Design a protein with these regions (language model features):
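Residue-level detector of alpha-helical secondary structure
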Residues: 12, 24, 28, 53, ...
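Short amphipathic recognition helices of helix-turn-helix/homeodomain-type DNA-binding modules
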Residues: 1-15, 27-30, 38-106, 392-398
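Short, charged amphipathic recognition helices of the HTH superfamily
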Residues: 18-24
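Helix-turn-helix DNA-binding elements, focusing on the entry/boundary residues of the two helices
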Residues: 22, 33, 51
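Conserved binding/catalytic microenvironments
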Residues: 107-411
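Short glycine/serine/threonine/alanine-rich loop segments
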Residues: 20, 31, 60, 184, ...
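Short conserved AdoMet
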Residues: 18, 59, 240
Length: 411
């Protein structure tokens, strides 16, 4: 995405606004002022919704939308909410059918099938953080069907069967994550159960550890913090070094949400002592220092230790800001952790930071970001008279259309 093109789009938006104030324009198009401000400075690409509203208001004939589309032309095509809803429903139905068929059948697949599946898992893992979830679902879903079909129709004595089951489990795990971040937690749990069956069937420690971590995440976002912490601790039994820091981080964030200062700090110490993986493994991105700072600062802020948290969360945001390939979900969550730390010092800055996080996922709806943003907006409710807080709360009254797949709450 060219910086020159983004600057030209920003300049054109400023030109159209003319002497009209940003607040007045926001009221006229029923959008929030902070998004308009960032669009005019070129710090982020304006959302499709914003440019469509501006085009309609200024009667440009779609000029801004075309400029924006030119800038994102190299990205994967978007999937409409209705198409994605049908796709998700079909995949979920297939999960139930294929589970019944596993361990039966006759046909034997070729090694080329296995290499294709392994390549897909690796490619999706490597691009997961910078690709909209809606674009990944069809790719992962297609290969998951292939993998599960092979496993379900399989050749019990074939020596490649365990490898196919691991690949099928990795793809089911990826679908679990994708369903979760489109707001479908029930579908996410369905695929996680299937991934867990493959993990148990193969005894693969990497898949087993990853599945455990995702169960902790589902419990955490459901508000069951005690179970989230318990599951994360249980994951250590696999002794899988790649996930040691991640599982400790999941325990820390859950205990922080419970207000358990001693337990949370002990878990953070374990996280910081754990090895940092040098490269990603199939289906799971590696723990990183920036992500560790996000967890540490966010946990301290949950415990009310805002001054201590602030430089840590600021460091995490800076680390992601300076990466051209920063994973957008983690980048946005770093901003949300920083917002939580700012609650003790500057409510306006805290609200604006949440809005920046939402801007980052405006065209890539991500449930983890919207859920945390909703939580922070609720915490800021006593300050609803502050303009930035009022704008944020107004923005969160309606979840993005592409997240409205299930009844997942955002506030």
């Amino acid at each position: 995405m060219g910086q020159d093109g983004r600057a030209e789009l920003a300049a054109r938006i400023r030109e159209l606004r003319g002497d009209k104030g940003q607040a007045a324009l926001a009221a006229a198009i029923l959008h929030d002022r902070t998004a308009i401000s960032r669009a005019e400075t070129g710090t982020v690409l304006p959302s499709r919704d914003l440019v469509e509203r501006l085009d309609a208001y200024y009667r440009t004939g779609g000029e801004l939308g075309r400029r924006r589309q030119t800038l994102i032309g190299g990205q994967l095509p978007e999937v409409s909410p209705s198409d994605r809803r049908d796709l998700l429903a079909g995949l979920a139905a297939s999960a139930g059918e294929l589970t019944v068929r596993i361990r039966t059948g006759r046909t034997t697949p070729g090694r080329s099938d296995l290499l294709l599946l392994q390549h897909t898992v690796r490619t999706v893992t490597d691009t997961y953080g910078v690709t909209p979830h809606s674009a990944l679902i069809p790719v992962v879903g297609r290969h998951w069907r292939l993998a599960e079909g092979i496993v379900a129709d399989a050749w019990k004595s074939d020596r490649l069967r365990p490898a196919f089951r691991v690949a099928a489990g990795q793809l089911a795990y990826l679908l679990c994550r994708l369903f979760f971040n489109t707001g479908d937690t029930a579908g996410s749990a369905t695929f996680l159960e299937l991934a867990e069956e493959h993990a148990v069937g193969t005894g693969d420690p990497a898949l087993s550890s990853a599945v455990t971590g995702m169960w902790s995440t589902l419990h955490f976002y459901a508000g069951d913090y005690r179970e989230a912490a318990t599951v994360a601790v249980d994951g250590r039994r696999w002794g899988y070094a790649y996930d040691t820091a991640v599982l400790a981080a999941y325990e820390a964030r859950a205990l922080g949400a419970l207000g358990d200062d001693t337990g949370a700090m002990r878990a953070l110490e374990l996280m910081e002592r754990s090895p940092i993986p040098s490269a990603s493994e199939p289906s799971c991105e590696p723990y990183s220092t920036a992500w560790g700072m996000l967890i540490a600062g966010g946990t301290l802020a949950r415990l009310g230790r805002h001054e201590e948290a602030l430089p840590i969360t600021a460091g995490s945001v800076t680390a992601y800001d300076t990466r051209s390939d920063a994973p957008y979900e983690m980048h946005a969550n770093a901003l949300l952790a920083h917002s939580r730390a700012l609650l003790g010092a500057d409510i306006t800055a805290a609200a604006d930071t949440v809005s920046r996080a939402l801007d980052m996922v405006a065209d890539r709806p991500t449930y983890s970001v919207w859920a945390r943003a909703g939580e922070l907006a609720s915490v800021m409710a006593p300050h609803r008279s502050v303009q930035a807080v009022a704008e944020l709360r107004g923005r969160l009254r309606e979840a993005p259309a592409m997240l409205a797949l299930t009844a997942g709450q955002t506030s």
